[in-house]
Amino acid sequence: IGKWLVDYYPQDMEVYTEAFGGMFWCYFNMDLSLYPNLKKIVYNDFNPLNYNLFKCVQNPSELQRALDSIPVQQLGVSNTPGEFRDRFVEYQTEVFNSGFTANSPDYLTAAKYAYVVTQVFSGSKPETSSFIDLKGKYRCKYLSFRDKLSKPDWVEHFTKITDVENLDFEDLIVKYDSPTTYHYVDAPYWKTENYYSNHDFDRQDHERLANVLQQVKGKFGMSYYDFELLHTWFPENQYKWERKLFAKAAAAKKNTKQNMGEELLIMNY
């Protein structure tokens, strides 16, 4: 879905922000050569573990060294040693229950966090999910992430991130807003807020987001699932609405009908 979204990005932007950065997938889908005026790339996430991970990603070689220091389950080894599950539980308990705050890049904590989130089912809550024993059938996603830290195209994206923030979305948008800013907003979806890790996001926050976006000087694109109040906050005769059907990967099961969803992109341009 990221490739579909970035097709709508204005190519004359000078500042790019994601107030709900998550894993920054839309940014990583951008062909940076198409944005010759882009001077500032801003990642933000209210989750301090995501914030710390992306502070570390700005120095990919140092983060790669931290990831290399932690053994992980291997392709072709069907009898996964118990130490990997034990390490997963240890790191899961440590990073999610410690009240972690990062004032400077903490590479080892970033590696431990990556160890957990790459070994749970896609779309699940990493703080409560169980370890996936791949039984040697697949390559661990932890290793795939580690490899990206030395691949030129990925390294270019990592090192061009200019600012990493741990702010409330409104503070982030106001701080970086300008006539040449593009805000991509992927807010927690309506009625699924408790699904997201390390923060709450309620009806009041959805309305607060709508209010701040209505006042920006720059351009914004916001992805959501459709719900009734959106039509009040962003009337279709005042904002551009685009829709796309997509397969819900997290809900897909073998030999069953694919579960489909509709992604909605609302723009002020």
Residue ranges and their predicted role:
Residues I1-W4, P60-Y184, P188-N194, N211, ...:
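SAM-dependent nucleic-acid methyltransferase catalytic core
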Residues L5, F54, A114, F220, ...:
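A residue-level signal for conserved active-site and pocket-lining positions in enzyme catalytic cores
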Residues W25-N29, N50-L53, S122-K125, I173, ...:
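Short catalytic/ligand-binding loop motif for oxyanion handling, primarily in non-cytosolic enzymes
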Residues I41-Y43, V164, K240-R243:
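Conserved beta-strand scaffold positions in the cores of enzyme catalytic domains, especially
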Residues N198, D202-Y269:
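Long, positively charged, glycine-interspersed low-complexity recognition regions
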Residues Y8, D12-T93:
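SAM cofactor-binding core of SAM-dependent methyltransferases
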Residues A19-G21, N44-D45, E165-L167, V185-A187, ...:
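Short His-Asn-centered micro-motif
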Residues D12-Y16, L38-K40, F158-T162, Q214-F220:
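Short active-site oxyanion
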